[in-house]
Every structure is written in C-alpha cells, then in structure tokens.
Amino acid sequence: MALLQISEPGMAPAPHQRRLAVGIDLGTTNSLVAAVRNSVPEVLPDEAGRALLPSVVRYLEKGGRRIGHEAKEQAATDPRNTIVSVKRFMGRGKAEVEGAANAPYEFIDAPGMVQIRTIDGVKSPVEVSAEILATLRYRAEDTLGDELVGAVITVPAYFDEAQRQATKDAARLAGLNVLRLLNEPTAAAIAYGLDNAAEGLYAVYDLGGGTFDLSILKLTKGVFEVLAAGGDSALGGDDFDHLLFGHVLAQAGIDAKALAPEDVRLLLDRVRVLKEALSSAPQASLDVTLSNGTRLVQTISHDTFASLVEPLVQRTLTPTRKALRDAQVTPADIKGVVLVGGATRMPVIRDAVAKYFGQPPLVNLDPDQVVALGAAIQADLLAGNRGGGDDWLLLDVIPLSLGVETMGGLVEKIIPRNSTIPIARAQEFTTFKDGQTAMAIHVVQGERELVADCRSLARFELRGIPPMTAGAARIRVTYQVDADGLLSVFAREQHSGVEASVVVKPSYGLADDDIAKMLEDSFKTAEIDMRARALREAQVEAQRMIEATQAALAADGELLDDAERTQVDALVAALRTIAQGDDADAIETATKALADGTDEFAARRMDKSIKRALSGRRLDEI
C-alpha cells in the first residue's frame, strides 16, 4: 500500500493550496510574465518556448487582432494598424509623444491621452496595453493550470500618476487583479538582492525600449530602501533607433516625410536589427529596398554609431547624477550597478556606466528578464505563499513632487520627490477673501514652481466653509500615497468639520464609463478571441503530432509494412494541409485521426523497446 506524504510544518503549501500570482513586465519593446514555481522564480514561455512577447498589437477588420510575434511580423506590411511601443503613449497627450513624427499612425489628440485610428476603430493606449496583458494572463493560466488571484505589474520608477493609473486601467480591462504596481528598478533589486544576499548601496540603471530609470537603493538584511529615483519617461532604445533611422536617411539624401508608412516601419525594423548587430560586431550593414524601388545599402561602424548616440547616452547620465545628489552619495559609494532593459546590451551604454561608476556593471541576470523575475517574487509574497521567515520590506519612493495650487498660480509642495511610500502628509491653508465659503483644490505633480509648468492631476472643491474674515479659516489638506504610488487627497475645514476628498484619477480621458464601454466591447469580441485562441492551440497540437510521428518513422519505420507506411504518410500529409487552414474542429479531427492511425505503430515501438531492454538479462536480474 502506498504511504501518503504529509509535509513538515512551515513547508511551502501544496500546489492546490497555493494562490497563483504572477509578475508582469509590461515593456515598450517586449513583455514577459513570470511566476514562482517550486520556490524558484522563472519566466513562463509560450507554446513555442519563447519567453519574450513583442509588445505589438495588429488590428484587423471586424474585431480581429494579432498580438505578439504574429503582429510584429506584419508590422511593415500593415503599419497603420500595427501598434508598437504603445507604452510610450500611456497617459500622454499628442504633444507629449516624442518620436510621433516618425510613427506611421493617424493620431487623434483626445483629451489628455493620445489615441490611434485603426481599421477596427479608434484605440487608446490603455486598450492596446490591455491586449498585451490579456495575452500574458492567458499564457500564465495555461501554464499554471488555474486562474490567477492577481499580478504584480512593473512600471518605470519615473512614471507619473497619469501613466500609473493608465497601467492599472489596462490591467483591469485585461481581467487582472493588480496586487501591486512595482517600480522596475525595485523589482530588479529584489531579483538580485534575494539571489545574491546582497547588502550595501546599489544603483539600478534601467534603459528599456521607451523609458529610462536610475534608482539608488540601500539593501540591508531583507530591507530594500529606495533612497532616490530619477529618470526620463521619454527616453529609451526606440530613441537610438530613431537617431540611426535619421542618419541612414540623411546619408541617402531622403526626406523622412516623403516615405510611405510601410517604408517607415520597414526601415525602423531594419535599423533596430542593425543597432543590435553593432552590439557584437565592429560594423554592420543595411540593405533594404523601399516600396518605390529605391535600394538603401549602407555600412555603419560601431564608432560612427557611438558618436551618433553620445547625446542620448549623456541624457541618461544627467538624471543619474541628480539621483546620486538626492541620495547624498557619490559613485565611489556604490557597491554594484545593476543593468536592466534590453537597451543596456549596447556596448556604448555598458562602457559609459563602467566609466561613470568606476566599475563594470552587474550583468549575471538577463536584463530582459530580471524585472519580471523580481515582480514574480513580490507577487508570490503578496499572495501569501512565502513562509514567515522569508519576508522582506520594500521602501519605495515617489519620483515627482506632489503639490497644490495656491494664489497666483504657484505650487506649494505637500510631498517632495523621493519620499518613501506609502505616505501621508498634511498642510494647513486659509481663505483669501472675506466671507469666502468655498475653496478650489487643484492637485499638481512636478518639480517646477508654477502650476503652468507642472502636470495637472485633479481638481475638487471644498464647500460650506463658514463665512469669516480672510485668513481666519483653517483648511487642512492631506495627501495620501498608497504602495502603488497612487494618490488620494482630503480637505477638511477645522472649525466646521466640512470635508471633501478625491481619489486622483488623472484627466487623461478615461472615465469609468469609458472603461465600462471597453469592457463591453471586449465581451463582444471575446468569441472572436476564443476562436482564434482555439485555432492556434489546435495548430500547435497538430504540429507536435506531425513532428512526433516523423521522428518515430525515422527511428522505427521498419516496423510498418508498405501499406501501413503509406497510410501513416497519408494521414500526416492530410493533417499538414488541414493545419494550414482556419477550421479548428477540422484540425482536431485530423490530429485525432493521425493519433488513432498510429496506435498500433506505437504499441510495436513499445514492444521493441521492452525487448531491447530485457535482451541478454536473466529472470532473476529483472
């Protein structure tokens, strides 16, 4: 009789008792999902074994779409409907979107946040991001075998309130419960700190496809304290691509405005390949033919590239110096520099970091995966899956100051930048006029002194103030930032007790009604999505069956007579043909036919294996 096993007290819960939570790195160029499995964080690949999901969504007629690799492959042939680098547009108006001039999209300057016209209608960056997040959610649930209780989603440390709220709304649209929005450098520090039991001061240099962050962290016995954060939410690997794109066109004497959208996307894709090639070679070549027949052939040396992008490299060092000053440390005080983001693979970046900090950066974890791995560890903790002795404390900070408008359009800072979160701060204000019975509270974010130079987050009114002489009323305004970096503001008149409050949802044009409509639209297209998903799953299973059968025939084909071999070959050929179509039921039927048709062959192979294993052995040896 088999003995049942009972785990030791304090051991990890059984799989069916674990609450499934994941970490998601929603990136500009690529996105990933990771989970803790058997106490080890690991990135979850797709059915083809690919860890990275290109952050690309292609919209088709009648509600269809392609996401990830399939969409990326069609970007050059259908650029207007294939959205790439959407993270750069999150929470941003058209005027704020850098690189928009080279983008082949038809932008619509909606209130607060830019939108994009596609063949399937106008799409907001939130909707596009939701498609990517939903794909990662499905991948995780398929791999882990159950529904998720939630996810930790990483955001650039320098994302402002509007961008953070947009990310949270995208997750909501994707059907994800957000356990925490975690700053990307902090996630990387978790992965490194727990893996290496590191202590001391560390800098996390995070250069992704569309954003740059630099955080200074102090790691001490399970405490991750962010001392300072700086960055640029509109600087990333895409900018290096656009600079090289402009150089190639200038060398050829071509005006970018004269290019067709298809040529813009094609050339940007080829330029990115060229940039990546220069990371491992002294020079690389570009050979591309445009839609009008013009052929561009150029060879770029690494030295030329390094000289070209030097201004961008220096742009990353400016917030680096600022963060060090804010943390009151010098480069010599830094024990290690962690590189995060695919763009940090460029030698010009690694050389600049090594020169500035006086030491080679840490690169023993994949810069593309380290953020997702750290997020997975944090998600596992928040889901309650880690033991009591396996806790750690995150002390993150807000990247930009939060303030209120005062008379004259001035900003009074309530919570200064680099304040540890969660946090609550209060300040008292008074009335400006005699008999004033209401006060307008205007919440802003930024480091400038004038409201016009800062980002407006929210407005609300406190009414019912007792009429008094100017300066007699006392209004206490409290700012409260939660662990996700999201803000609530409360105002209370001290004499009468009248109150007003607002949970800040930045005015980027996405109200609850908009989200409800998007959810309704997603329900309408759910059937299309499920059909596409079923088709893809059937095609993958068919390909697996074909490859397994061919391998078996190559190894043991002699076990079949000519008639049997002909029948199996016919079934394989039929399945291969049907799998190229779009009828999932037909593919499943053909796959089952091949499985049934090779049952006898499989049995003979099993007999052969058993005979070979037993050959030459005595009965008492078995």
Swiss-Prot record:
NCBIfam families (UniProt xref): HscA, PRK05183.1
Name the record gives this protein: Chaperone protein HscA homolog
Keywords, ordered alphabetically: ATP-binding, Chaperone, Nucleotide-binding
GO MF term list: ATP binding; ATP hydrolysis activity; ATP-dependent protein folding chaperone; unfolded protein binding
Protein family per UniProt: Belongs to the heat shock protein 70 family.
Superkingdom field: Bacteria
Entry keyword annotation includes Nucleotide-binding: yes
Pfam families the UniProt entry points to: HSP70
Protein function: Chaperone involved in the maturation of iron-sulfur cluster-containing proteins. Has a low intrinsic ATPase activity which is markedly stimulated by HscB.
Taxonomic lineage of the native organism: Bacteria, Pseudomonadati, Pseudomonadota, Betaproteobacteria, Burkholderiales
One GO process term, biological-process aspect: iron-sulfur cluster assembly
